[in-house]
């Protein structure tokens, strides 16, 4: 598999796993960090550096997977911002 395809697959896997984080703040932070990291490293052309970044990404993927499991073991109430129901001023 080409390096580009591997990077895209890793990016998608990281985003998918981070969306599973139960805590809103951690979830949004993880998504933002993943996007920022991939944008920052987009211009890298050195294959050794690409390999280092890919390995770091794989380690981060495993870390996120562990955090998802831990987060589901110790769940907390959802934040108000996470509720799907829109509140109306007429609702009392």
Curated annotation (Swiss-Prot):
Keywords: Coiled coil, Mitochondrion. Transmembrane segments: none annotated. It is found in: Mitochondrion. GO terms for biological process: iron-sulfur cluster assembly. One of its GO terms (cellular component) is L-cysteine desulfurase complex. CDD domains: Complex1_LYR_LYRM4. InterPro entries: Complex1_LYR_dom, Complex1_LYR_LYRM4, ISC_assembly_LYR. Residues 40-68 form a coiled coil. Signal peptide: none annotated. Pfam families: Complex1_LYR (PF05347). It comes from the Eukaryota. Its main location: mitochondrion. Stabilizing factor of the core iron-sulfur cluster (ISC) assembly complex that regulates the stability and cysteine desulfurase activity of Nfs1 and participates in the [2Fe-2S] clusters assembly on the scaffolding protein IscU. Belongs to the complex I LYR family. Component of the mitochondrial core iron-sulfur cluster (ISC) assembly complex at least composed of the cysteine desulfurase Nfs1, the scaffold protein IscU, the accessory protein bcn92/Isd11/Lyrm4, and probably fh/frataxin. Interacts with Nfs1. This is LYR motif-containing protein 4 homolog. The lineage of its organism: Eukaryota, Metazoa, Ecdysozoa, Arthropoda, Hexapoda.
């Amino acid at each position: 598999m080409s390096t580009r395809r591997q990077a895209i697959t890793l990016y998608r896997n990281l985003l998918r796993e981070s969306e599973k984080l139960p805590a809103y703040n951690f979830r949004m932070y993880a998504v933002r960090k993943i996007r920022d990291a991939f944008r920052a490293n987009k211009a890298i052309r050195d294959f050794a550096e690409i390999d280092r970044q890919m390995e770091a990404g794989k380690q981060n993927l495993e870390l996120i997977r562990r955090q998802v499991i831990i987060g589901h073991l110790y769940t907390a109430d959802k934040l108000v911002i996470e509720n799907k129901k829109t509140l109306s001023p007429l609702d009392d």
